[in-house]
Every structure is written in C-alpha cells, then in structure tokens.
Amino acid sequence: MLTQLKKVGTEVHRATNLFATYVGKNKVKCPGDVKKFIFLCGANKNNGEPSARRIELIDFSEKHLSNCHFFLAELVFKELSKDEEDSSSDNLLDIEADLSKLADHIIIVLESFSSFTELGAFAYSKQLRKKLIIINNTKFINEKSFINMGPIKAITQQSQQSGYFLHYKMAEGNESIERSDGIGQIFNPLYDILSRNDRAIARTLKKEDLDPSNNFNKDSVRFIHDIILACGPLKLNELIEIAIKIFGKDSFYRKELLKHLGILMAIKIISCKDDFYYSLYKQYYFK
C-alpha cells in the first residue's frame, strides 16, 4: 500500500492528493445531521466484559437510537495498548477525560465503586455536568448521602434539567452486574433525551480543525474514518504516511491516530483484521 501511495497514478495516490487539496483549501464540508457520540460508563463483569446493564443499553441504542454512537472507554484503551513504543504513558483516567470532552452525552450507570468515582470526576467539571445522564437506584433518590449532596446536587444546580437523572429499582450485589435486571424501565425517558437532534448548520472545516495530532474531537474522528473508507484497508503505518502527506511532517501521529482508531472501533464503524483497518460504515461523513 505504501508503494501505491507514493506511485503517481494509483487510486490511493489520487485519493490522498484529493484529500490533501480539499483540506489545504479549507473545503471540507460537514453536514448538520451527524450522529451524536454517547460515552457509556459503568461496571464490568468478572470476565472483563461490560456489565449486563451496559450491554442492554448498547443493544437498545442499536435498535432505537439510530442518531447515536454509543462507545466504551475500555475499547479505546485496548487500541492504545497496541502502541508498544509508548504504552507506559497511557492511563484510563486520561483517556476518559479526552473521551468526555468528545462526547455529546455521558451516561453513568451507578453500579460499582468505579462508576461513583467517574461521577465525582465528571461532576467536578462545570463544562461536563450538562452532558451527564445518571442512572441510579430509586431507593437512593432522597438519601442524604455524599453522592446526592455532592456531585448530583452540583449537576442539578448547573443544568436545572431533572431529565438527566433516571431512576429505577436496581438489583443489588455482584449478580446485578453479571445478569440483567429491570433497566428497561428507563429506556423511554432515555429515548426522549437522546432522540432529540439539535440540528446544526452545515459547516466548512479548516485544515487545523482536522489534524489528528492536534485534535481529538468528532470532526477529526470522522475525517480519519473517511480516509480509511477512501484509501483502505490501511495499516497504521500507512495511515500515518497519509496523515503526513495531508498535514505535514512536523507532528507525531502514531499515538493520536491509535486513539482515533480506538473510538472508531468502539462505535463499530471500522474494524481491523490482520492489522488492516477497514470501514464498516460504507459512506462518507464529509462532503
């Protein structure tokens, strides 16, 4: 593929040049009806897989929320762990901070000590409070606990939208993480929150907005997908070469591209086989 990229006249060479031209002239257009990114936090089962509640929420979104991409931090972290050159500098908290900035909404299922920690971390940021959708046990609605008087009160004061707090009678204990309970009770109000599309005006993006070495946002993520769709399947080193062709050699792309690939894998619009990344979405985000 690298040979095709550098060889004049090949399809990959033409596609890369076309990308570079449009990006260089600030002519990349983003439509207004793009999907939301929903960051889903909560517990894991003993085998490391997402809790039964999180699996049910993902299944619900895939069937009924076609305007949303749900994703988990663990899948992004897994992709970053492939970087043998710099894996020691990665930690889940820093990755979660980046993902929370990227997300349109953050759903936290309060089902474990780790999820309470995530609530405290996200609620500390005034910028993130308005994004939070908290799923909690009905029995704790009126309890004078640190959670209610601290992070939940802070979120309420910030957003003044009680619809961001969803309650039902949750099963308790470790079995509740391993097996499904009645979380379907909150599906209707969750649908009401997430199905609303705040349709944005179509935008024309600048080159600096798309450079993955300086950005980790929905636009840069969508752009990397479109490169993979146009030029793929691609190996990581080939994607790096294309990024250098479009944006220049002055940046370090490997780690940042792995983070972009991680979120694309997590929202299931690309996949990877034998180290080749390819699109499952089959349509371009940008025009």
What is each residue range found by the language model?
Residues M1-L119, Y124-K287:
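Conserved catalytic or regulatory cores that recognize and/or transform ribose-phosphate-containing ligands
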